[in-house]
From Swiss-Prot:
Belongs to the glycosyl hydrolase 43 family. GO terms for biological process: arabinan catabolic process. It is an enzyme of class 3 (hydrolase). Gene3D superfamilies: Glycosyl hydrolase domain, family 43. The record marks D158 as: Important for catalytic activity, responsible for pKa modulation of the active site Glu and correct orientation of both the proton donor and substrate. This is Extracellular exo-alpha-(1->5)-L-arabinofuranosidase ArbA. Changing Q316L: Very slight decrease in arabinofuranosidase activity. The relative activity of the enzyme against the arabino-oligosaccharides increases with the increasing size of the substrate up to arabinohexaose, after which the rate remains constant. The substrate-binding site accommodates six arabinose units, with cleavage occurring between binding sites 3 and 4. Pathway: Glycan metabolism; L-arabinan degradation. It is found in: Secreted. It comes from Cellvibrio japonicus (strain Ueda107) (Pseudomonas fluorescens subsp. cellulosa). It catalyses: Hydrolysis of terminal non-reducing alpha-L-arabinofuranoside residues in alpha-L-arabinosides.
Length: 347
């Protein structure tokens, strides 16, 4: 029969502190967390900058990646071409990516509407991310690519930039429809390179009987490619976002020795044929994990993503997790860090 041990004062005290720590992690002990969607980051000098979906693209700054201050919005008004591309555009610019190149910061962004591929990816450029600098000014360079219903079986949102071993810069993108694509950018990183070179890098099954104007059931989007060792790692979000507690977003990964693929999962299945190894899915406290980016800073690797907090009416929160690697070179994250990383938004 089981043996029962008395609960000592020390054991009770330890259990109480553990419960309090978990409660503080869940509620951030009263501190206001950073609520972001589709987060990407970069660093200028000793300051990190965080970019999020929102009106004009919301920008935050931090010295330690934990305490964040509102910095600016990249757009004071919507891009002049937005309503032409997407008549039902609501003013929220989606899914940015930020990329440094030859002394400039390139901020890519998406114009779209839910469930439609009346979409375009644009880019705006700045010399600095410090709004106090006299050189701070966003200059919109317009549309990089545009998707048109019935013409294109892809959706021009969710851009992410990667430079290959030869210095060639590529853009990955895509959401639902025919999956995730990759193409070469031209020298000034504002348009596809000519002659154009495009690749399909990941997709899920879609019925051939579905009308091309419909998003379909292939729940895949938000590619992000990280170079590590001998491989390019393609992260993607499967499932549905933006549904509070009903969100099914989760992260999968594959890898390739070529930036153009094929990207294979741990079983050897091509991500172009439905492959993808689970990286993180979340738990009862944190759901809808996805739309990640990934970085190497000061010799350490990090996964940046949003997660919906059940204890706060499923409001989206910033998460920055340590990215580890197993013996076979596959990325790993510790789900416990969803509780231990708690951002604070400073006034």
């Amino acid at each position: 029969m089981p043996t029962h041990h008395p609960i000592t004062r020390q054991h009770w005290h330890h259990s109480w502190l553990s419960a309090l720590a978990l409660l503080c992690a869940s509620l951030a002990c009263g501190a206001k967390q950073v609520d972001v969607h589709d987060p990407v980051m970069t660093r200028e000098g000793d300051t990190w900058y965080l970019f999020s979906t929102g009106p004009g693209i919301t920008i935050y700054s931090s010295k330690d990646r934990v305490n964040w201050r509102y910095s600016d919005r990249a757009f004071g008004t919507e891009p002049t071409w937005a309503k032409r591309v997407s008549p039902s555009f609501d003013g929220h610019l989606w899914a940015p990516d930020i990329y440094q190149h030859k002394g400039l910061f390139y901020l890519y962004y998406s114009v779209s509407a839910f469930g439609k591929n009346t979409s375009a990816i644009g880019v705006t450029v700045n010399k600095t991310l410090n709004p106090a600098s006299p050189d701070y000014r966003w200059e919109d360079k317009g549309i990089v690519i545009e998707s048109v219903p019935q013409r294109d079986l892809w959706n021009a949102i969710d851009p992410a930039i990667i430079a290959d071993d030869h210095g060639q810069v590529w853009m990955s993108f895509g959401s639902f429809w025919g999956g995730l694509k990759l193409f070469k950018l031209n020298d000034d990183l504002t348009r596809p390179a000519e002659p154009q070179e495009w690749h399909s890098i990941a997709k899920l099954e879609r019925s051939v009987l579905m009308d091309d104007s419909q998003a379909g059931s292939a729940q895949i989007e938000a590619p992000f490619i990280l170079r590590k060792g001998d491989y390019y790692y393609l992260f993607a979000s499967w499932g549905l976002c933006c549904r509070k507690g009903d969100s099914t977003y989760h992260l999968v990964v594959g890898r390739s020795k070529q930036v153009t693929g094929p990207y294979l999962d741990k079983t050897g299945r091509d991500m172009n044929q439905g492959g993808g190894s689970l990286l993180i899915k979340g738990n009862k406290r944190w759901v809808g994990l996805g739309h990640n980016s990934a970085y190497t800073w000061d010799g350490k690797d990090y996964l940046v993503l949003h997660a919906y907090e059940a204890a706060d009416n499923y409001l989206q929160k910033l998460k920055i997790l340590n990215l580890h690697w197993d013996g076979e070179g596959w990325p790993q994250v510790d789900e416990k860090e969803l509780d231990s990383y708690i951002s604070q938004r400073l006034k």
